[in-house]
């Protein structure tokens, strides 16, 4: 039995004393103990070594004590498993030496055997669950098919992802074939994560906001919703679309347990657009953690007042930044725990 199930209660829409809190990228570069391991091991070694991934996952639980842990991994382990080479380059970030630019390229990409290619993730989950000792729930995650597609076609991060969008518009059959392969792989991957022991999953649609509302339905939401439908009976599913406020209405009608919101959408608008019945997660501007601690606490309390304490998970509107002082991150978590006291 979980000692702290506040997060799962909020996902079910149950009444709570206070909302739960965790932070995207909470196992990250703002923690000195994370930096120590980063300096010793390269990025994918940390992802692919269960002992390292588990240790990194529990670091923030010890240090700042959020109400949920999120497995340390990366969305790009999925395309790696599908036969796409992915490197992590200094000062560039994700880099794909042979991006996908044709139907022939798409046909070389395959839906893998998950245990064979991503078994190390399942081992990390089992190890993390042991280390957490039922203190808090564990979240597993995956990138949205569109977000994975963006990297696979563009070959690296981009301000506009015009190659990826251009591929959709000029070669829609190939684009949809690739998106479906990514979707099928992601469903199998998340199902294995649930079997391995995660308590909830989150889909990160980091680049969904690059698309117009019409294109979003065709190239992103259609595929995310397949994942939601496939997982909803097995585990709570959170969908986080950065910059996707325009899709909250459609998302709110889905079987997702919660929707993540970024800081460009007010609590009032998010509640209104999503239909008012679904749990929302967010949406503190990560840069605001650079504010003085009393300001952070005041703003967090105001944010909870705006969203309401029920059907709400306190989080940032995107991942925590590397330059945030640890005591500021802790103040964010503490502010939620002090709410209403």
From Swiss-Prot:
Site positions (Transition state stabilizer): 74
Cellular localisation: Cytoplasm
Which UniProt keywords are listed?
Cytoplasm, Decarboxylase, Lyase, Porphyrin biosynthesis
Please list the GO terms describing molecular function.
Answer: uroporphyrinogen decarboxylase activity
Query: According to the UniProt entry, what is the EC number of this protein?
Result: 4.1.1.37
Protein task: Catalyzes the decarboxylation of four acetate groups of uroporphyrinogen-III to yield coproporphyrinogen-III.
The record's note on quaternary structure and interaction partners says: Homodimer.
Question: Can you tell me which family this protein belongs to?
Answer: Belongs to the uroporphyrinogen decarboxylase family.
What PANTHER family does the annotation carry? Answer: METHYLTETRAHYDROFOLATE:HOMOCYSTEINE METHYLTRANSFERASE RELATED, UROPORPHYRINOGEN DECARBOXYLASE
Q: What name has this protein been given in UniProt? A: Uroporphyrinogen decarboxylase
Q: What is the organism field in this record?
A: Flavobacterium johnsoniae (strain ATCC 17061 / DSM 2064 / JCM 8514 / BCRC 14874 / CCUG 350202 / NBRC 14942 / NCIMB 11054 / UW101) (Cytophaga johnsonae)
């Amino acid at each position: 039995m979980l000692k702290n199930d506040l997060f799962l209660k909020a996902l079910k829409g149950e009444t709570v004393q206070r909302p739960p809190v965790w932070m995207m990228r909470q196992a990250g570069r703002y923690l000195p103990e994370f930096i120590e391991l980063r300096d010793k091991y390269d990025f994918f070694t940390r992802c692919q070594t269960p002992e390292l991934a588990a240790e990194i996952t529990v670091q923030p639980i010890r240090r700042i004590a959020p109400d949920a842990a999120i497995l340390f991994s990366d969305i790009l382990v999925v395309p790696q498993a599908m036969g796409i080479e992915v490197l992590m380059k200094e000062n560039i970030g994700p880099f794909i030496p042979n991006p996908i630019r044709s139907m022939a390229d798409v046909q070389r990409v395959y839906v893998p055997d998950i245990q064979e290619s991503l078994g190390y993730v399942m081992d990390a989950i089992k190890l993390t669950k042991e280390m957490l000792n039922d203190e808090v729930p564990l979240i597993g995650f995956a990138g949205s098919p569109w977000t994975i597609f963006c990297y696979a076609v563009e070959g690296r991060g981009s301000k506009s992802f015009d190659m990826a969008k251009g591929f959709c518009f000029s070669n829609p059959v190939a684009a949809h074939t690739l998106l479906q392969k990514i979707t099928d792989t992601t469903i199998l991957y998340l199902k294995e994560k649930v079997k391995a022991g995660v308590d909830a999953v989150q889909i990160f649609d980091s680049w969904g906001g690059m698309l117009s509302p019409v294109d979003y339905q065709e190239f992103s939401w259609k595929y995310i919703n397949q994942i939601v439908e496939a997982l909803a009976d097995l585990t709570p599913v959170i969908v986080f679309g950065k910059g996707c406020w325009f899709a909250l209405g459609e998302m709110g009608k889905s079987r997702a347990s919660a929707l993540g919101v970024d800081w460009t959408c007010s609590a009032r608008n998010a509640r209104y657009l999503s239909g008012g019945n679904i749990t929302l997660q967010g949406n503190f501007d990560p840069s605001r953690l650079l504010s003085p601690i009393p300001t952070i606490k005041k703003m967090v309390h105001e944010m909870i007042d705006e969203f309401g304490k029920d059907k709400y998970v306190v989080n940032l509107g995107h991942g925590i930044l590397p330059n945030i002082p640890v005591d500021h991150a802790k103040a964010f978590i503490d502010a939620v725990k002090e709410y209403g006291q």
